[in-house]
């Protein structure tokens, strides 16, 4: 994880709406999907937010343990940052936390690509819950 950085659009220390249980959320910058009615449009830019070391992100996550049950990767598009997130995910799992990931890519697409990319395979293997497919406002649940 030494000297690796991630373009981060935002970070929530504690969230109850981005997966099951209290969790931290890493919002990455950059997305090519251009979903209609995207709820995080500003995060589509790969330059939005701040370049943060994976070490610093992990320290922030660790500061929330034992309160949190897991970490969610959202964005932007997490799968645009496969190499960085696969390294971060490995460290998160060593803390005993679960990982959720929201991606605009479909599970079918990921299945086709997974054997072509070692880091993708490693990342997907670390994810406990994958929420796939482009954002569709008609499927949004309002409580």
Predicted regions and their residues:
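Flexible loop residues that form catalytic
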Residues: 43, 76, 135
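Structured loop/turn residues at beta-strand edges in well-structured enzyme cores
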Residues: 33, 66, 125
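Short Fe-S-cluster ligation motifs
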Residues: 59-79
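Conserved, mostly hydrophobic/aromatic
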Residues: 26, 77, 130
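Canonical radical SAM enzyme core domain
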Residues: 45-58, 79-123, 129
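Classical nucleotidyltransferase
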Residues: 124, 128-143
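N-terminal [4Fe-4S]-dependent radical SAM core
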Residues: 1-27, 36, 40-46, 65
């Amino acid at each position: 994880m030494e000297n690796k950085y991630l373009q981060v659009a935002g970070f929530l220390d504690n969230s109850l709406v981005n997966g099951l249980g209290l969790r931290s959320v890493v919002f990455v910058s950059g997305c090519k999907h251009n979903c209609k009615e995207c709820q995080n449009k500003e995060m589509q830019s790969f330059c939005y937010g701040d370049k943060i070391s994976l070490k610093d992100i992990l320290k922030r996550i660790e500061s929330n343990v034992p309160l949190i049950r897991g970490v969610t990767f959202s964005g932007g598009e997490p799968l645009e940052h496969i190499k960085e997130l696969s390294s971060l995910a490995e460290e998160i799992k060593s803390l005993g936390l679960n990982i959720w990931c929201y991606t605009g890519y479909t599970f079918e697409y990921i299945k086709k690509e997974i054997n072509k990319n070692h880091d993708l395979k490693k990342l997907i293997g670390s994810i406990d819950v994958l929420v796939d497919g482009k954002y569709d406002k008609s499927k949004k649940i309002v409580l």
